[in-house]
């Protein structure tokens, strides 16, 4: 596939995904009548529904590989009628609601109606089930690592399962935005969505970029211009414990390694410009000409002599 066609393909997929994320950004669980809705698919994965504060519609964000026609909608609260599908009031379920349309209207006790809209994108799906913790707990400290979490990645008919360590990452992107970036780590080098195998992978939220294309365009341009060590990323829809978090970029963690930044010099090092947290690192310095702090993130040979040499070379 040529570069132009490849770029066009993911741009169309991303456009649809961006619409879903824009809807999600405006949503929150509604209070009041205690109505909630969710689905449980064939793999027993739960997908929570969200109520948009803009239009009052409840949205379900479903993986690309889930059949809308076979989706079983569950709900809390008393539902007396549905505009489509087979309603089971006793068990609080609605079967076949989205067989002909992506929208269904439910009538609640008292005559109030709620509209539910099911949405999907064509992006790969990445689902995490946390073990012994919650997303709220993870958000309290980005540095705490939580092992033993179940990961499922689906891309069309391809399904990958594994166990990963999960943690937060980032500096200003972690502090300033509700949509957080994360890191996952496998126990051994693992390929994700066809990218070169590695243990550590990052999930970029792109919270400050509503278009969600700036990062990808920069890396695609760098690759086409022949720059070495260009980070590879792919778009995914991310769920954690059934909560849809939006569109993320999963990609290689910037680190020294054969399939990453392949440095051979013992004093070969990777520094990060970091005016917010550099002084929290073990090794950092201030560059007066740039009026910026730089932190040593990684070095080939981690001993005092090579660290001193690397910082001097910089």
Task: Describe each PLM feature range.
Residues 31-100, 112-117:
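Predominantly extracytoplasmic/ectodomain segments of secreted and cell-surface proteins
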Residues 100-104, 111-156:
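N-terminal module-boundary/linker segments of secreted carbohydrate-active enzymes
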């Amino acid at each position: 596939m040529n570069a132009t066609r490849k770029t066009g393909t993911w741009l169309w997929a991303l456009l649809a995904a961006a619409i879903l994320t824009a809807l999600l950004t405006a949503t929150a669980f509604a209070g009041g009548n205690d109505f909630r809705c969710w689905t449980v698919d064939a793999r027993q994965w739960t997908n929570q529904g969200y109520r948009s504060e803009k239009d009052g519609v409840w949205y379900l964000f479903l993986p690309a590989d889930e059949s809308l026609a076979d989706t079983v909608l569950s709900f809390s609260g008393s539902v007396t009628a549905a505009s489509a599908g087979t309603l089971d009031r006793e068990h609080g379920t609605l079967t076949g609601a989205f067989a002909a349309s992506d929208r269904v209207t439910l009538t609640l006790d008292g005559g109030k109606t709620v509209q539910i809209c099911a949405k999907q994108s064509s992006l790969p799906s990445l689902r995490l089930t946390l073990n012994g913790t919650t997303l709220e707990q993870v958000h309290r400290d980005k540095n705490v690592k939580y092992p033993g979490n179940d990961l499922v990645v689906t891309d069309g008919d391809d399904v990958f399962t594994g166990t990963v360590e999960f943690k937060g990452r980032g500096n200003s992107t972690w502090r300033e935005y509700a949509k957080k970036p994360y890191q996952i780590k496998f126990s051994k080098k693992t390929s994700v969505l066809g990218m070169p195998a590695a243990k550590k992978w990052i999930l970029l939220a792109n919270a400050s970029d509503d278009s969600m294309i700036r990062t990808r365009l920069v890396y695609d341009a760098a690759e086409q211009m022949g720059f070495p060590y260009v980070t590879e990323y792919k778009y995914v829809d991310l769920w954690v414990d059934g909560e849809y978090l939006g569109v993320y970029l999963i990609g290689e963690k910037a680190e020294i390694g054969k399939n990453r930044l392949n440095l051979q010099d013992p004093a070969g090092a990777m520094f990060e410009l970091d005016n917010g947290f550099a002084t929290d690192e073990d090794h950092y310095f201030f560059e007066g000409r740039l009026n910026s702090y730089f932190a040593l993130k990684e070095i080939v040979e981690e001993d005092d002599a090579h660290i001193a040499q690397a910082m001097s070379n910089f």
